[in-house]
From Swiss-Prot:
One function term, GO molecular function aspect: metal ion binding
Subunit record text: Component of complex II composed of eight subunits in plants: four classical SDH subunits SDH1, SDH2, SDH3 and SDH4 (a flavoprotein (FP), an iron-sulfur protein (IP), and a cytochrome b composed of a large and a small subunit.), as well as four subunits unknown in mitochondria from bacteria and heterotrophic eukaryotes.
FT transit peptide: 1-78
Organism: Arabidopsis thaliana
Top-level lineage group: Eukaryota
UniProt name for this protein: Succinate dehydrogenase subunit 4, mitochondrial
Example of a GO biological process term: mitochondrial electron transport, succinate to ubiquinone
Transmembrane segments: 130-150
Tissue specificity note: Expressed in flowers, inflorescences and stems.
Pathway: Carbohydrate metabolism; tricarboxylic acid cycle
Phylogenetic placement of the source organism: Eukaryota, Viridiplantae, Streptophyta, Embryophyta, Tracheophyta
Annotated positions binding a ubiquinone: 121
Gene encoding the protein: SDH4
Location of this chain's protein in the cell: Mitochondrion inner membrane
Length: 151
C-alpha cells in the first residue's frame, strides 16, 4: 500500500510541477475569466498578473473605435426602408424580365451545341435523333416553367 501511495504522490507532484512550469500562452489550465482576458488582449496574456501601469499600455486603443452609431446622414429613415425593401425583393427574385429575354437565344445556342457534340460522339443516327428530341422536350419544359414563374 505504501508503494502505491508513493507512486500516486509522485504523479500528483509531477502534475503540479508541469502545470506551474507550463508555457504562458497555454490555454489548458487557465480559468474562464483569464481566458476571456487573454482573448481580448492582443498579446494573449492575462492582464490581472501584470501591474496596472503596464496593463494600461497593453490594452487596445478604444478611442479609435466607433461607439456612437447615430451618425448623421442625408438619407432619411423612410428612404432607407424603401431601399432595403427594394433590395430584398430584387435579391429574392434574382432576375428581371429584361435579363430573361436576353437569355432566350442562349437556349437555342445550347441546343445547337448539344446536337454537334452528339453528332461527334453518338454514331447511331436513331439514338442521336432520340437524344436530340429528348433534350428538345426538356428545353421546352424548362422554358414553360420559367415563363409561368415569371407571370
Amino acid at each position: 500500500m505504501s508503494l502505491r501511495r508513493t507512486i500516486l504522490d509522485l504523479h500528483r507532484q509531477t502534475q503540479r510541477a508541469t502545470l506551474s512550469k507550463s508555457l504562458p500562452f497555454s490555454m489548458s489550465h487557465i480559468s474562464s475569466a483569464s481566458a476571456t482576458a487573454a482573448v481580448r488582449n492582443p498579446l494573449g496574456r492575462d492582464l490581472s498578473s501584470i501591474p496596472f501601469a503596464q496593463a494600461q499600455k497593453l490594452k487596445p486603443d478604444s478611442t479609435n473605435l466607433v461607439t456612437d452609431r447615430s451618425i448623421s446622414s442625408s438619407i432619411g429613415q423612410s428612404e432607407l426602408n424603401k431601399a432595403a425593401k427594394f433590395s430584398r425583393q430584387s435579391s429574392s427574385r434574382g432576375y428581371t424580365n429584361g435579363s430573361f429575354l436576353r437569355k432566350i437565344p442562349v437556349v437555342f445556342h445550347i441546343h445547337e451545341g448539344m446536337e454537334e457534340i452528339l453528332a461527334d460522339y453518338v454514331h447511331q443516327e436513331m439514338t442521336r435523333n432520340l437524344i436530340v428530341m429528348s433534350l428538345g422536350l426538356f428545353q421546352i419544359i424548362v422554358l414553360k416553367d420559367i415563363i409561368l414563374f415569371l407571370l
